[in-house]
Amino acid sequence: MTQMRDLMIINANVRTVDARNSCAQAVLVSGGRIAIVGTETEVRGAAAPDAEVLDVSGKTVVPGFIDAHNHLSVAAFAPDSVDCSTPPLATLDEVLEVIERHCRNIPPGQWVRGINFHASHIREQRNPTRYELDEVAPNNPFFLIDASCHAGFANSAALDLVGIGAHTPEPWGGEIERDLSGKPTGTLLEAAANLLHSASWNDYAERDWDRAVELLHSKMNDYLAVGLTGVGDAMVTAKSAELYRRADAAGKMPFTLQQLHGGDHFFSMQDLGRSDTVDRIMEPESYLLRGGAMKIFVDRAYPSPAIDQIHDGCKTHVGANFYSKSEVHDLAVRASKLGINLAIHGMGNCAIDIVLDAYEAVRRQSNADTVLRLEHAFIAETGQGQRMADLGIDLVANPGLAFGWGEVFNMWRGENQEHLKLFPVRSMLDAGVRVSLASDHPCGTYSPAEIMWTAVARETMAGAPLEPDEAVTADEALRMYTINPAHASGRGSEEGSIEAGKRANLLVLDRDPVDCATGELRELQVLRTYVDGVLRYERTGS
């Protein structure tokens, strides 16, 4: 194997994101690791004679971004799916037209998936029915995935293939929407969409595993172009774990991928009594493919997250959960005893309390260094932040979703609920919580620049302010996309900051994300992306 040459990055504005937020002028990379961070003189004095020299002409260098909560295995199949994005599609007729046009070229009987549909963003403000989908996809089982990924809309062929009919009982954790006669309308909520999601995903993958690996690799290259050098897939099933194993074995993983393992389907009950489930979670890791963590969903998006509202001084509960409080407690405690790290999804304040109660029990019996993650906290009470901080919980937040979904979350919260805050990142930081920013892609953009901008600007797609008192600074946003998610992913000692001994996961940017104007932050461009000292992406002309 050819020995890697040392790399000197000089004439730079190096934002190390270390404990002191210190800056430097140069970095020496040797053997894929950061060797020296300091002045150009110090770096030149320690570099090998044949070292490569990269003069960045005053550009900013930061650690690679880490997206700790993403759904890469879902997003990878976008090129083979029907793009039903709303916007730019503005009416249901436009959505149906693009579906029909796509399906004309698909062999009969082959599954087709539609993506990025959001009913609240079209004129009709409704979902398509099975019969409308039958008309535009008459020869194929078709499944349109809601942009939230918590619902889907199927045609008759798809429903028939997975055995959903008038007499199908309601599944655990989900709902089959029915007409007055009891016949399914095609709308499937939460776990009811499991069979459709799994059947269509499995068909896409198993039809051609080699192509599936190439699609995954291509999506990872897209991520490199926006500066991602580490990603966590926040719902890995047995089949998507197989896809990752194949990609890793083929040398098609250009950065670290952490698997947060779920059940057999996207939303399905975790069963730690099954040896195959535990074996999958605890499967030996490779350098780039990591495991050892489990994802648990607590509350649902439909009818709404689990929220305790206050009306006339009395508490009212709205929303629904997948698990009861005792079930979450037992799952978390058992997982901890097995040595499994945890990432638990809690969107509303009631669900968050259930998660915190479970984590308090885990902390009583486990090592204080165990990483315990709360995913989302979309609608929370500011007082919950202090409890998170006391328990040492990592909050993985998604303020980028406020851009497209802000009005929906406001509706879910309810009127005159002053005790509830939307995406309360500022409050959580002030309480001492370690907060990471993450995309939840494909539910929202995967661009760290856009998500950091949303956290700083607190604006929706319509340009409306969304609780601007919860805004963070650009400096804080940078930490929340680098060192904090490194810790949440169990790799804080490996990466996330530019310090001697850490992996040389580095970005060269076209502007300083800390000092640029807020409006410019979302326009930030990555010029170069290095993973372990290897140049994995270079912007043309940079």
From Swiss-Prot:
Keyword annotations from UniProtKB, A to Z: Hydrolase
Temperature dependence: Optimum temperature is 35 degrees Celsius. Inactive following 30 minutes incubation at 50 degrees Celsius or above, no loss of activity following 30 minutes incubation at 25 degrees Celsius or below. Little loss of activity following 30 minutes incubation at 35 or 30 degrees Celsius.
PANTHER family: IMIDAZOLONEPROPIONASE, PROTEIN LONG AFTER FAR-RED 3
Name of encoding gene: nfdA
Complex and partners: Homodimer.
Catalytic activity: N-benzylformamide + H2O = benzylamine + formate
Induction description: Induced by N-benzylformamide. Repressed by glucose.
Propeptide: 1-2
Organism superkingdom: Bacteria
Entry's pH dependence statement: Optimum pH is 7.0. Stable from pH 7.5 to 8.5.
UniProt cross-references to InterPro entries, sorted A to Z: Amidohydro_3 (IPR013108), Metal-dep_hydrolase_composite (IPR011059), Metal_Hydrolase (IPR032466), YtcJ-like (IPR033932)
Family: Belongs to the metallo-dependent hydrolases superfamily.
GO terms for MF: N-substituted formamide deformylase activity
Enzyme Commission no: 3.5.1.91
Role description: Hydrolyzes N-substituted formamides, but not amides. N-benzylformamide is the preferred substrate, while N-butylformamide is hydrolyzed at a much lower rate. Has very low activity towards allylformamide, N-(2-cyclohex-1-enylethyl)formamide and N-(alpha-methylbenzyl)formamide.
Gene3D superfamilies: 3.10.310.70, Metal-dependent hydrolases, Urease, subunit C, domain 1
Protein name (Swiss-Prot/TrEMBL): N-substituted formamide deformylase
Notes on activation and inhibition: Completely inhibited by HgCl(2), CuCl, CuCl(2) and AgNO(3). Partially inhibited by ZnCl(2) and SnCl(2). Almost completely inhibited by the reducing reagent DTT. Partially inhibited by phenylhydrazine. Moderately inhibited by phenanthroline and 8-hydroxyquinoline. Completely inhibited by the thiol-specific inhibitors N-ethylmaleimide and p-chloromercuribenzoate.
Cofactor: Zn(2+)
